[in-house]
């Protein structure tokens, strides 16, 4: 159930592609009314600050069980900062799941840490080329401009940016000659076109894009933020870089571009093994069901 009607979005497109039923509410009041009409036996599981606050309050008033997953480690600014505070403050009305330890430490109540998870593709990407990618929302907290700056220091790389957002026009104007912007894409059709994923976020929880890339055998070079610090084993399945240090990331990207097939194959397999051992669907669904039954 989606809180607001934003028309056809990347998320609703994916829901349709997967054949998953969903309801789109017209506003917050409609969302709460629809939740309240659900049978008492229904368990509500919320994601995101708006659905979380409204869902927990509705569940409290109607006596329903509610579980909330907290994904973001970013406090935000302005109105978003207030919403983030309200989200954490109302966490006491729910059983809470945090996708990383740093996020769990920010919550005022005990929570269960369950990392994000992804399915394992049958075959990995080849990672034999020079295609470097950013995948995510083109907004300040994701730092897409830092990714675009890498292109100037890595002349042998082909830089591809996947995603939409408020910074798209500015990025296209400033970096369009060095970085190819693809807009939003169904990444299931794109991972085979990528050899290395770079994450330049200022804040993160545990981004699904990192898990998806590694499940495909694509190593990740990332700023050391949020749950990525625990996911990435530096120089084994990817690389960790001090946040904001673009030149240091460029050195690692250039190392990858110069590396031979043996090095790439070893790191690709290490990335897949990491996901298979700790971040696959089978590992996490049981943990979530345990929270439901607690």
Features from the language model and the residues they span:
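Conserved acidic donor-binding segment of nucleotide-sugar-dependent glycosyltransferases
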Residues: 234-235, 239-246, 255-261
